[in-house]
Amino acid sequence: MLDPQGLYAWEPKGLAVVDMALAQESAGLVMLYHFDGYIDAGETGDQIVDRILDSQPHQVVARFDHDRLVDYRARRPLLTFKRDRWTEYEEPTIDVRLVQDTTGAPFLLLSGPEPDVEWERFAAAVQQIVERLGVRLSVNFHGIPMGVPHTRPVGLTPHGNRTDLVPGHRSPFDEAQVPGSAESLVEYRLMEAGFDVLGVAAHVPHYIARSPYPDAALTVLEAITAATGLVLPGIAHSLRTDAHRTQTEIDRQIQEGDEELTTLVSGLENQYDAVAGAESRGNMLAEPVDIPSADEIGLEFERFLAEREGDN
């Protein structure tokens, strides 16, 4: 493997600001990370990243070489043409940024398109950055398509070696093989190297998984802020407002839709309530319910990923 440091470059001004922040944050910084392009049902992670960058002060600390990592023919960046010339190019960027929450507390955000190649080298580069920037906890987040109804609270699956930071959420999975991602490999390699990592996956109703689902993003954001101590009330308020609007629109579409969709949602509600009831009784008197098998979970992930890649 080539030297991972060849994949990124430091921004001197941003790095100097991080060093100043580290002098005041003896425990280290939190780093959030999410990449666009893999399974992110309900655009859960994308919504959080977009709102952070739109609403919070930030500056670039390190920039990855996207020419090495992004396959432009697979995900063609947009250029704007006006009259007789190209006027704008939406350059893909994979950056580490220093961000301030509402109280001014610093944290890091690594985001951009998911690398298409050199995953191992990329994961090693992220580890170098984590070491250099004194990261105490790395947190990734996304949505996964699940057989759950939109009329019930959004479930979470915490993963990594710091799931204790998101108590009260038991994983519905025993063991499952799903298509890999750079985000997951980074988590795996960081844990392997002894770093603290937390992943938060929201359960998004599979029938709306390809549309923005603010409820999922809000639930994930609340879990992240509770686990890290970050203060982001403006983003939470924005997501809560959008979530109310989205739920109203989903209910309207279901009421105006065919009977098959109504039956589907009703069946998912019954299944959800049966599982919740079984858990509250310790599974001692639970009636049998249909829980997705590992193979079914893997197929659902593959189907969603194939549909997403087909749109690109």
Residue ranges and their predicted role:
Residues 208-312:
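A conserved C-terminal secondary-structure "cap"
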Residues 2-112:
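N-terminal short beta-loop-beta anion/metal-coordinating cradle
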Residues 43-47, 117, 121, 181, ...:
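Conserved active-site and cofactor/substrate-binding residues in soluble primary-metabolism enzymes
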Residues 105, 113-165, 186:
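Internal, conserved structured core segments that host functional sites
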Residues 62, 108-110, 139, 196-201:
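Hydrophobic/aromatic beta-strand patches that form the interior of the parallel beta-sheet core
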